[in-house]
Amino acid sequence: MRIEKSAPLLLSTLMIAVMLLSGCTEPEAKQVPTREGAIPPDAAKSTPETDANPPEVHSNEFRDPVPLPYPVNTAGAEDSPFILPDGDILYFFFTPDVRVPPEKQLLDGVTGIYISTKRNGLWSTPERIILQDPGRLALDGCEFVRGNVMWFCSAREGYTGVNLFTAMFEDGRWRDWHYAGDTLNKEYQVGEMHISVDGSKLYFHSSRAGGKGQLDIWVSEKMDGEWQTPQNVESVNSPENEGWPFITDDGGELWFTRTYKGTPSIFRSRRIGDEWSFPELIVSSFAGEPTLDGEGNLYFVHHFFRDGIMREADIYVAYHVSQNTAYHSISRLFAQMMKFHTKI
């Protein structure tokens, strides 16, 4: 999978980890740090007030984006969000320090997929989801959850490259992880993906041959239990990068990330009959990986850059204008509070 300079943090981390796993031995035994404890003391929390390139909304359907409050966002890097339809369960990728090279992130004991739940309007302390056997290396991310099945990408021992895996939620935890097969991983070259609510269509990005640009969005239909040869979603692709697709549960909207004026931005295409409409810009300026809850609230990752260098990443939300503004106001309050902290 080709990785562009502006691609999300997670994938660049995974790709370098691939080169390391083939020669890695068992990691040295050490005390596993906490997520917050792994954030370096000199990490300064970025805030909307200090952001040189804040995300900008281009649609009157959404309010101005705000960062999710602590304990979801920290002075580390929160990336690759996935929100469930009820809006109360959030999955995301975390690494404590974007300055640390991937070969060290692989061994830090905290980089990986996390989950946070919202109760009474407040997000819980995120917990890491372990998707590998004890003593074996893996760097997991780009999670997608449907029911009791999680799809995720991983660079791990015993496999070459970044591959898709699945896991099952049973007895209160994720288990029974399996390689998703050569058809998806090798033949179709599936990257980050989203499956329609009826399970019949798999949308994904890939640099596979036959596309319009660098990364393109493709769709594969399931027939007789098998994923068919992918088709290019031509109406949304361009010579630029298009990827990180999200399909609304009604199947009527395709959300994705595209390079716009040199930075990742969020676009939407609507289903009209059997075709996807010309994409419209929704959020620009280092915004990507859109994911929506059932009320139409838009969650995404925002990367903070200063002097051309990435400093941090946070999960943001742009509330739909039809939604209650109470939690929106709480998020703004937390954002104001966080500017006084150099480290959470």
Predicted feature residues:
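C-terminal motif of bacterial Sec signal peptides marking the signal peptidase cleavage site
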Residues: 21-23
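Bacterial N-terminal signal peptides that target proteins for export
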Residues: 2-11
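Short, conserved micro-motifs composed of acidic
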Residues: 28-344
